[in-house]
Amino acid sequence: MQNLTRRRAVLVAPGSDERKALKALQSNADEVVLDLEDAVAPAKKAAARDLVSRLVRESDGSRAVSVRINALTTPWAADDLAACAELGPSLTSIVVPKTETHKDLQDAADAVGTVRLQALVETPRGVQNIDAISRADHLDAVIIGYADLGAALGRSRAARPEHWLAIQEAVLVAARAAGIQAIDGPFLGIADDDAFRHSASWTSALGFDGKWVIHPNQISSAAAAFTPSNADVDNARRVIDALADAEAAGNGAAQLDGQMLDEAVAVAARRVLAQVGGQ
């Protein structure tokens, strides 16, 4: 996997509400996504775009800041993309909602140049095309959008994380094959309760890199779920050191604690260290 922004806990904030947006930008989330889509009424789209552009320019760079634009099929998308293109390196990425095809991302990339993208997959067609979507240029992550996808599938909002396993696995495998991040979408509730924590621990155990949250009080639990334990980090460092020592000695194989170390073990160790910002 390439060197990507850490996204254990990603807080989404309405782009039309300056107070909430500023609170999000002052939070300890790994990334803040300022939303121009679902959280903004049609009459407020232009004002929200101007506000978000100003907030991104004024951000101090201490955390990743991305923007969720309106869907490409809407009358606001072109202006959203143009505004994001003007933000340049102060913007971490653009989240493209309702991504259904590789072409959707290519069209977005053509409009914004070098700005990185994230694909929010929230339709059955998007799930069907997840492999092609994940291979798009300039793409850092794919995200599952449960609310819209669940509605399209006729799935109950009370469905447990386990009921989404087939889709979660498809997104995860596609992301890993493309060398990008798999991010779990928001839990459909704002409480930091047992149900939310279970949803985070479930996708963390599957192998996802992080989770969107819709309330600041969920940040700590989400970050904790996607942060390796100290013991896991120590073991990963020992694995990497053992492999480096074996290579320096010209040995074809490495051992640690009586176990042979292969490339699969090395990949897992590097992923653990990447999750804590290590090398």
Language model segments and positions:
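Expand to "…catalyze enediolate/carbanion chemistry for C-C bond making/breaking, isomerization
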Residues: M1-Q279
